Amino acid sequence: MNRQDLLELMTTLDDAWNAGPGSSLWETFRKRHTEDVAVYWPGGAPPTRGRRNHDLEAVEFFKTFPDNHLINRPYKILFADGNHTCSVAEFRGTMKGPMKLGDQVIPPTGKSLRVEFCTVATWNDQGAITEERLFYDQVGLMKQIGLG
């Protein structure tokens, strides 16, 4: 894949994210991840493994933050090097649904969040992510939604 192809793949992946589950673009979000993708979240927890599991956690995220939006047109930063992309964008949303944290369910707070969100993705030659590393201020996010 050339640099421009990777930048377009990343941008349209985030377009699909912004459209959300149930939209005609959601299949793009799913197919941009390999069947055995590893998704690393902030906080050091073991990665989410597999497209299906990542899809399930994404759908749950939309239940908690149904109006979430990643500002990717334009990104704050977007570049490609080798088979990697790196994007930095503003991420916004409102906690309108319950949040599942382990065995706990936290009721919605109705509070909004705004954080910088960074994705470092490793792509295969077929245009799908094999490894995705996500970075954002977890403590700041929790404080903004009234949980910190």
Spans of model-derived segments:
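C-terminal and inter-domain tail/linker signature
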Residues: M1-G148
